[in-house]
Amino acid sequence: MKKYLPLYEFLCASQKESIRFTFLEIENILESRLPQSAYIYREWWANGGHVQADSWLNAGYQVDSVDLVNHCIVFLKS
């Protein structure tokens, strides 16, 4: 989860019930590019089964929606 630790920390600090990010905003938080698969496969954003999911799940959020056309995602506090 080391690569995704900045996202985890950002989400932990948030008091919002819902957070919408563009993929670019997430890349800015990470100070790193998302893998190409994040832009192509909805499954990359699944709530579990992948190391990146630990960053939002452990911070108390779940993915609510993913828009692969407009490159944005909504997290909801779980």
Report each predicted region and the residues it spans.
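Positively charged, polyanion-binding regions of nucleic-acid-associated proteins
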Residues: K2-I19
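Alpha-helix initiation and N-capping motif
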Residues: Y4, F23, G49-H50
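Short glycine-/small-residue-rich flexible loop motifs, especially phosphate/cofactor-binding loops
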Residues: Y8, L24, A53
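Hydrophobic/aromatic-rich, well-ordered segments within soluble, folded domains that form packed cores
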Residues: Q15-P35
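Nucleic acid-binding interface residues in structured DNA/RNA-binding domains
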Residues: L30-S78
